[in-house]
Amino acid sequence: MADNKPELQRGLEARHIELIALGGTIGVGLFMGAASTLKWAGPSVLLAYIIAGLFVFFIMRSMGEMLFLEPVTGSFAVYAHRYMSPFFGYLTAWSYWFMWMAVGISEITAIGVYVQFWFPEMAQWIPALIAVALVALANLAAVRLYGEIEFWFAMIKVTTIIVMIVIGLGVIFFGFGNGGQSIGFSNLTEHGGFFAGGWKGFLTALCIVVASYQGVELIGITAGEAKNPQVTLRSAVGKVLWRILIFYVGAIFVIVTIFPWNEIGSNGSPFVLTFAKIGITAAAGIINFVVLTAALSGCNSGMYSCGRMLYALAKNRQLPAAMAKVSRHGVPVAGVAVSIAILLIGSCLNYIIPNPQRVFVYVYSASVLPGMVPWFVILISQLRFRRAHKAAIASHPFRSILFPWANYVTMAFLICVLIGMYFNEDTRMSLFVGIIFMLAVTAIYKVFGLNRHGKAHKLEE
């Protein structure tokens, strides 16, 4: 008898996938957190974004090579299951789920703060609760509708960044808003020099900058729902990282060139100041709206990922089969519902803890180490993937470059970043939280004998 159970649907086009990845990566960290890294490194933070982007490029090309031959939902978690061991597939899926849950809770916390800009008397838990409801509705819709919602969410902040870069270049080269006098590049070398924070400040900022790229691998999560995945995913992998790199580096370049780096953050958001520079008096309200949608977009992308990770775990028999339930619209409804429920519980922190900054910092920082696990897994899995696909690799149109040396050097770089996090007081606790979480899920794996549950399944053809 044929199995007519609903399955995930391939309803995502290239533009949806690209904007889902952009939406998940470019979050409130760029709009609100630029001042932190500049405080440590000064203008050299530009170099930190470029270096981190280079290594993330190698990671993405490795993932793209595997996605072309095996476009499955769960992506790197499934590859870990197949090419490393069921345990690493399990650990990867839970680590990525935990990362996005932490990011999601921090994003809805931020939403409460942004709404108070217009309604200062409103309790922050109210807009946080409304945000959870909106994200739930978007993620329980058919995947194509979800893709459209996230496309427009992400488009708002992408457009804002582009406009900000264009305005900034006008100020730098043509003196817009500066009496016609071009500002030039003096702010990059004055006020302590390009490496104003020294090498220690640069390396400290580099650790945080690496974390800002987390989310770019969301492309892999969409693989099982992409139309014509070989073409769509190849295009998305090739475009997304370059766009993110341009947006990050372009925005930071404009900010540190227009304003002295040691004044950024003391007079408000650098994005607000850039728009205000050319006389846009409503700049604060505009940017507040943009960061509000940025937070919604980041949370929306995160819940999409969380639902698919729980689905992948259930398919690999590492969660109850009920978690693999798919609605008639092709949505992994059980995984999404559980993730939304925990997000709802997390939103209660906004009621319990009145200081939103404490909630945001504690929760967001806890996501960094679990978010790096998929990167290590992608690089290691590809080493074994190559051996399993020798014949196909010879004619592969999207092979990664500098293999295998790029894999080894990138892993060494990520290890150095983790070591740097330990020696930085601002990030040490987040490292410990990540380690505790990974030890906890490992203990559950052993205690419940999840290693006895079958071998990997091919989720999607």
Curated annotation (Swiss-Prot):
It is found in: Cell inner membrane. Its main location: membrane. Keywords: Amino-acid transport, Cell inner membrane, Cell membrane, Membrane, Transmembrane, Transmembrane helix, Transport. Disulfide bonds: none annotated. It is a multi-pass membrane protein. One of its GO terms (cellular component) is plasma membrane. It catalyses: L-threonine(in) + H(+)(in) = L-threonine(out) + H(+)(out); L-serine(in) + H(+)(in) = L-serine(out) + H(+)(out). The chain crosses the membrane at residues 17-37, 40-60, 97-117, 123-143, 156-176, 201-221, 244-264, 278-298, 333-353, 360-380, 401-421, 430-450. One of its GO terms (biological process) is threonine transport. Activity is inhibited by CCCP, a proton gradient uncoupler, but is insensitive to monensin. It comes from the Bacteria. Residues 1-16, 61-96, 144-155, 222-243, 299-332, 381-400, 451-461 are cytoplasmic. Residues 38-39, 118-122, 177-200, 265-277, 354-359, 422-429 are periplasmic. Pfam families: AA_permease (PF00324). GO terms for molecular function: L-serine transmembrane transporter activity; L-threonine transmembrane transporter activity. PANTHER family: GABA PERMEASE, TRANSPORT PROTEIN YIFK-RELATED. NCBIfam families: AA_transp_ThrP, PRK10746.1. Permease that mediates the proton-dependent threonine and serine uptake. Shows higher specificity for threonine. Cannot transport homoserine. Belongs to the amino acid-polyamine-organocation (APC) superfamily. This is Threonine/serine transporter ThrP. It comes from Escherichia coli (strain K12).
